[in-house]
Amino acid sequence: MTQRASPVSFAGPKRFMKPGISIEELPHIDLIVISHNHYDHLDRLTLEKIYQKQEDQPPKIFVPLRQKKWFEGLDITNVVEMDWWEEQEFEVWKIHAVPVQHWSSRSLWDRNQVLWAGWVLEHPKFRFFFAGDTGYSKDFINLGKKFDGFDLAAIPIGAYEPRWFMKQSH
């Protein structure tokens, strides 16, 4: 839970508030889904701290297509890479990578070189949709139809300015 969403610690967007909970206070985590590779969604130090805390039972991490390579050289294992519409089973869950309207980049030279994804986590008793960052698109209608609706959804609110830049992806 670094202070900046940036490749460097001294520049870039700074956190406005402290996280609501520390890594040490987190309960045991079984799985993590990563929506895309922007620095505010994929933080190396945070993931490393979670793994260190749970080294006996590390969480399984689900990432969009071509994102697994980023984990090479880190002491983080159990990474599962998925393309849109792929499904993996994890314990009683079905994990689905699904399309959303966004993009990926960690530098000026790698725009859209890895995929971004929303996630549907299906349990025998309920369905959860995690959008990550996304603009409004027909994907919402298509996902609702394909999965017969959701019991719970985490959909982003905010990141609207400047509108000319953000309207397609937030």
Label each region the model flagged.
Residues I34, H96, I155:
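Redox-cofactor binding/interface segments in oxidoreductases and associated redox assembly factors
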Residues M1-N37, T46-Q52, S105-R111, S137-D148:
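Pre-active-site segment of Zn-dependent metallo-hydrolases
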Residues M1, N37, V100-H102, G132-T134, ...:
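Active-site metal-binding loops of divalent metal-dependent hydrolases
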Residues E55, V63-F126:
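Metallo-beta-lactamase
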